[in-house]
Amino acid sequence: GGTGVSPVRGVISYFGEHPDEVKKLHTILGFKSPADILFRDDLKNWEQQMDLILTVDSSDVPFYRTGLVTKYIPELELDNIHETAAIVVGPPIMMKFAVAELLKMGMQEEQIWISQERKMCCGLGKCGHCRMNDTYICLDGPVFCYSEGKKLFD
């Protein structure tokens, strides 16, 4: 369905260009169709810089993997799970199942970061659109460690 690549484009590019700052970088990006793929020039660079898995919901083109991004999380070769961090961005239902897969692999909630920016409207804490429980997504986030952010799912 949707894509969370826009909010993490900068961090992916940064670590792709500074490989000495990470031991290994895995990136899984999902798009609805090949026509919906964003940042094609970046993707060409990222293919050379990291382990990149690109998925689309369905396609006849053999280059693309098909299906949900969560299908490919168990394939990641994470050498030391306790020294690994994950950033999960996208539709809430995808984030829920992606986090579940990461937890099954042995990651701790504190190692997983989620983004809730889809909830924001004014960005100033005035309209209340982004308020979930006592948290204003626009003021307190939008990025949360999963141990804190798990209470912010609908």
Language model region names:
Residues 1-120:
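FNR/FR-type flavoprotein reductase catalytic core
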